[in-house]
Amino acid sequence: VSLDASTVTLVRYALLDPRVLILRAEEEVDAFAVLTERFVLLLDTMSTPALAEAALDCLRPHLRQRPLLVLNTHADYDHAYGNRVFSAGGRHPTAIIGHRTAAARLTSQGERERLERRQRENARYADVRLVAPTVLVDDALTLDGGDLTLEVRRAPGHTDDHLAVWIPQLRMLLAGDAAEYPFPQAGGTAGLRGLESTLTMLAALDPDVVLACHGGTTSASLLTSNLAYFAQVRAKARAAFTAGGLPNSEVETVFAFEDALRLVGTDSKRVAAFYRSFHEGNVRAALRDLAAG
């Protein structure tokens, strides 16, 4: 994604509770802020320190002397590469909440190598430094904001370190990348199983509003739409496997990309091109799962 280094817009929807703010980095990612009586929670720090600083500038008028907390939904670059702004020596040092596995990812040699590769390929990542969460979550964490309760829940599948936030007073789910329009990316075969379980768990909360980091939707129907998509991925993979298909089968012959988009009410002219690779990965994960027995 190519975007200005500090382009973050505060997005408002008329029916969205004013205590929840959407911070949009053009078409790359949405972060969110929850304004409680006791603190403000920033959900994700985007893909660069410059974007995190721009998000902080959007938030500053809303802090009103309340402490700021930060939460990483997971350690992917577009959700955690701005953490430096909130670390010791950064512009606004504060606690960063994340899953224990996210901390391990952000301190790993593999993640350092991925960042170095990004920095060689794109100057926008030059100022990124890997900063791990400082408050670690294993399964769940409750943040009591006074007027709002923020229930941090483990939500694996897209990645193993993924967290989502449920706000019961608003019947609102901050889904991160666990739900996505048109559909999320499962992290391999184990991730596919995990994501199906996570979506089922999140749908059982019966939210009125679902905010995801990609797709720009607020509709609670996103969860059932994602579940219907994965059910069809499973059905198509099963039919192909029964007919002799192998994990390396041509995905278009198993479940065509346009057919998948039509199922969720869109087409390739209205979604980013990378969703094709998401879909191919999801179908291959289902085929591998069947091959493994």
Regions found by a protein language model. Give the residues of each.
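Conserved beta-strand hairpin/beta-sheet module of binuclear metal-dependent hydrolase folds
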Residues: 9-61, 164-177
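Active-site HxH/HxHxD metal-binding segment of metal-dependent hydrolases
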Residues: 57-136, 142
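A short catalytic or substrate-binding loop motif that flags glycine-/basic-rich loops and adjacent residues
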Residues: 25-26, 135-136, 156-159
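Metallo-beta-lactamase
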Residues: 39-40, 47-49, 142, 149-151, ...
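A post-motif C-terminal structural segment
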Residues: 215, 226-257
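C-terminal regulatory/interaction regions
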Residues: 243-293
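Short, conserved active-site entrance elements at the starts or edges of catalytic domains
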Residues: 5-12, 131-153
